[in-house]
């Protein structure tokens, strides 16, 4: 499919909307009423510090809702107001935050079901309204909805759209897109649908494996088996790794994306020489400003003396997981929770998701005796009001134990 031509057709349609229905001021007011927190505002004014009895809370300099998430959530709320009687669907969670998605369900926004990675669009009818979430949607899903006569409300984060433009540029110049991301993640699925030939790499270890293959040190059968689910159809590592460009899932760890980019630049330089480097490697920065800012703030926070860390965000939130990864890498006792209810203020316990995933774990004697310093941050999909509720629970434990 000519994805650029399709996007031009879609954007000209009177059944497509990516600008919302009201002014930016109205959107900001609606979100403030729903999600902002007076307590968080006060803590920010006090240098991101709260002292309450034996408890000291330190907030990261930057955390919580980014502007892309704010825009997406506000547009989803506006959609229900603009279409009070129509059936409204959303192709996935609007963002990776359970409280926000539950609020949409209460507004009678319907979520398209998915089984084994396949969405059931049979429930969507001509004239229905369909919201595309902040992560975007695959170009194939967009075309299906457009052809069906749906009203499409596109809340895709502009930073995600920027990555789509990047991989389309790779495709135009016959470069393979090396996408740093999780191949099952909604955003990466959408991005890869706009690419031509692509390979999704989860981390630096996988990038080094591919680099070695480019330099003649790998095994073709092993390569194809390892990346069978993370590459474009018919991917041929002997042919398709001659020209590469790097892009990323916007929520990945910034430092790792940069390191992967440098690795492939060095690899292609070694393979083809400086005179031909630009013919075989294309470097474009697709790192999201908000992701970079929040990760930078987290690195600063973990440099301070902390007894423990609480990271708040959806368990399926990539950007939240990477914030937790930063704390764990510094040896800090750190807990990833998705809602305030994971903290038992009457029992001094916390139920959390370990970094490696799997089953939830419950920690006894969560806040230990004596004065204690707690660092707090949250993912880009977590409202300030949720962070406030977590702090209130910590304060109660500090008072009672």
Swiss-Prot record:
Keywords: 4Fe-4S, Iron, Iron-sulfur, Isoprene biosynthesis, Metal-binding, Oxidoreductase. The keyword DNA damage does not apply. Pathway: Isoprenoid biosynthesis; dimethylallyl diphosphate biosynthesis; dimethylallyl diphosphate from (2E)-4-hydroxy-3-methylbutenyl diphosphate: step 1/1; Isoprenoid biosynthesis; isopentenyl diphosphate biosynthesis via DXP pathway; isopentenyl diphosphate from 1-deoxy-D-xylulose 5-phosphate: step 6/6. GO terms for biological process: dimethylallyl diphosphate biosynthetic process; isopentenyl diphosphate biosynthetic process, methylerythritol 4-phosphate pathway; terpenoid biosynthetic process. Disulfide bonds: none annotated. It catalyses: isopentenyl diphosphate + 2 oxidized [2Fe-2S]-[ferredoxin] + H2O = (2E)-4-hydroxy-3-methylbut-2-enyl diphosphate + 2 reduced [2Fe-2S]-[ferredoxin] + 2 H(+); dimethylallyl diphosphate + 2 oxidized [2Fe-2S]-[ferredoxin] + H2O = (2E)-4-hydroxy-3-methylbut-2-enyl diphosphate + 2 reduced [2Fe-2S]-[ferredoxin] + 2 H(+). Isopentenyl diphosphate binds at residues 96, 185, 317-319, 381. [4Fe-4S] cluster binds at residues 66, 157, 288. Its EC number is 1.17.7.4. It comes from the Bacteria. It is an enzyme of class 1 (oxidoreductase). Dimethylallyl diphosphate binds at residues 96, 185, 317-319, 381. Its cofactor is [4Fe-4S] cluster. (2E)-4-hydroxy-3-methylbut-2-enyl diphosphate binds at residues 96, 185, 250, 317-319, 381. This is 4-hydroxy-3-methylbut-2-enyl diphosphate reductase. Catalyzes the conversion of 1-hydroxy-2-methyl-2-(E)-butenyl 4-diphosphate (HMBPP) into a mixture of isopentenyl diphosphate (IPP) and dimethylallyl diphosphate (DMAPP). Acts in the terminal step of the DOXP/MEP pathway for isoprenoid precursor biosynthesis. The active site is at 187 (proton donor). Belongs to the IspH family. Binds 1 [4Fe-4S] cluster per subunit. GO terms for molecular function: 4 iron, 4 sulfur cluster binding; 4-hydroxy-3-methylbut-2-enyl diphosphate reductase activity; metal ion binding. Gene3D superfamilies: 3.40.50.11270, 4-hydroxy-3-methylbut-2-enyl diphosphate reductase, catalytic domain.
